Regions:
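ABC transporter nucleotide-binding domains
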Residues: 33, 51, 75, 127-129, ...
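Phosphate-binding site recognition
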Residues: 53, 67-70, 188, 195
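Short, glycine- and charge-enriched coil/turn segments that flank and shape catalytic ligand pockets
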Residues: 4, 86-88, 184-188
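Regular, well-ordered alpha-helical segments
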Residues: 54-57, 179
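An accessory alpha-helical subdomain
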Residues: 139-213
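Nucleotide-state sensing region of NTPase/ATPase domains
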Residues: 57-147, 156-159, 163
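Pre-Walker A-like glycine/lysine-rich segment at the N-terminus of P-loop NTPase domains
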Residues: 1-54
Length: 213
């Protein structure tokens, strides 16, 4: 598995929200240096942090599902972040929901990086490296093993793109195996899926052992 990607200093310059949590439309501009976000209860401080975390982890650090983050009465949410890595400026956006003109359409999550549509998740995760500390993080220590594995997967996915790819491969193969067992497949198909599971599983286990001796 490849070495950790080189993480350069990242500066977030702006954040735009549409139908995210309680924000129908909001735009924020950030300066450089240490930034404090203040406001009354319910003003949206945590929403800002959650949106930034979402562009980093591709999921909520508050353990919320994507559909739970869509503003009530809306069919989608959209987050756009402007940031720089060194002297290079970038824009990253995440959109989740369905076509408002087709209420029966499936919920879809899409990523865009520097104006390029249909960007893969593997190309996005870790672009904006963040560390989140909140009361919910006690779950990592006091919670069950699943919480610790989830945290470890997020951290390793940001550091090692190949780990994230192996994790996606494993989850995809696991889903295929579950579906195949329901339809009574032939042994050859199951054997092929099991080989894919084993290959991805070895890569995941190897990197976890390296990270936590």
């Amino acid at each position: 598995m490849t070495e950790a990607q080189n993480i350069q200093p990242v500066t977030i310059h702006g954040l735009t929200l549409a139908n995210f949590r309680n924000a129908e439309s909001a735009q924020y501009t950030f300066g450089t240096g240490l930034i404090f976000i203040t406001g009354n209860n319910g003003a949206g401080k945590t929403t800002i942090l959650e949106a930034i975390g979402l562009t980093s982890f591709l999921r909520s650090f508050r353990f919320a599902l994507d559909r739970e983050m869509i503003r009530f009465g809306s069919s989608f949410y959209r987050i756009e972040t402007g940031f720089s890595v060194g002297t290079a400026k970038h824009r990253l956006s995440i959109a989740f929901g369905r076509n408002p003109e087709d209420p029966k359409a499936a919920l879809v999550k899409k990523y865009m990086f520097d104006g390029r549509a249909n960007t893969r998740a593997a190309e996005i995760i870790g672009r904006i490296p963040t560390v989140v500390l909140s009361p919910d993080d006690l779950r990592i220590i006091a919670g069950d093993h699943a919480e610790r594995r989830r945290f470890l997967d997020l951290l390793l996915s940001m550091l090692y793109p190949a780990y994230f790819a192996a994790l996606q491969q494993y989850q995809r193969a696991l889903k295929m195996r579950s579906q195949a067992l329901k339809s009574r497949p032939d042994e050859g198909m199951l054997a092929a899926i099991d080989r894919e599971l084993a290959s991805a599983g070895v890569q995941i286990l190897e990197k976890r052992r390296q990270f936590i001796p």
